[in-house]
C-alpha cells in the first residue's frame, strides 16, 4: 500500500451554521488506496456530509481532510461522485451523457467517442448507446451514471446510496457489477448505504456512525475474499458479519 493514505480525516467537525449543533464531531479515519469502505448509520448522522466534505462540496468547520495528500479543493480531478439519482440529461443520448465529462475536459471528439465506447462496453450498455434516458430501466440509468463517473479515470469514487431506488434483485446485480468494475479499475471507493447486507457484501471495511453529532462508533473489517458473487449471501460467514454489523448499528443508534 502507498505511504500516503487515499483519504485522511483528522479530528473533523462540521456545522452548517455557527449557531447549529455539529453534524459531525471528532472524525478520525484513514482509508488506504484500493479499499472499499462503506459508511453505515441512522438517518441524519452525517454519512452523506462526509462524502461531500471529501469531494470539497462542503467546507470543513474544523480539522483536516486530505485526498492523496491534497486538500479536497485541490483533489477534485482525482474524484468522481455517484449520487442516488442518476441525474442524466434527458435530451442527450446514453453515449452523449457519458461523453459529457470528457467534453468538459475539452477532449477531442475522437478521443471522447473512443473512451465512451469502451466505458459503455464495460458496463454492458453498448446496445443502448443511442437511446435516451426515458427508455432505460433504473438499473440501466445507474450504469450510465457510473460509466460517466469513470470517464475521467478517477482514483476515488464516492457513492451516496446509488442503488437505494432499485428493487432487491437489481440492487444485488448492481452490487456485483460495481465490484466487477472496481476489480478492473482498482479505484478506492467510499460508499454510503442504509443496507447492512449491502455494506457487508461490497466492503473491505464498514464504518458505523452514531448520531447527534455523527461520530465513528465502530469499525468492522470484512475478511471475505474478492471476487464476490451473490452466493456469498448464503454463507454462514456472511450472515455472521451481517448480524454483527446490525447489532453494532443498533447500539450506535441508542448512543
Residue map of PLM features:
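Conserved ABC transporter NBD signature motif
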Residues: 63-75
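Hydrophobic anchor residue at the start of the ABC signature
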Residues: 146
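Catalytic Walker B motif of ABC-type/P-loop ATPase nucleotide-binding domains
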Residues: 157-160
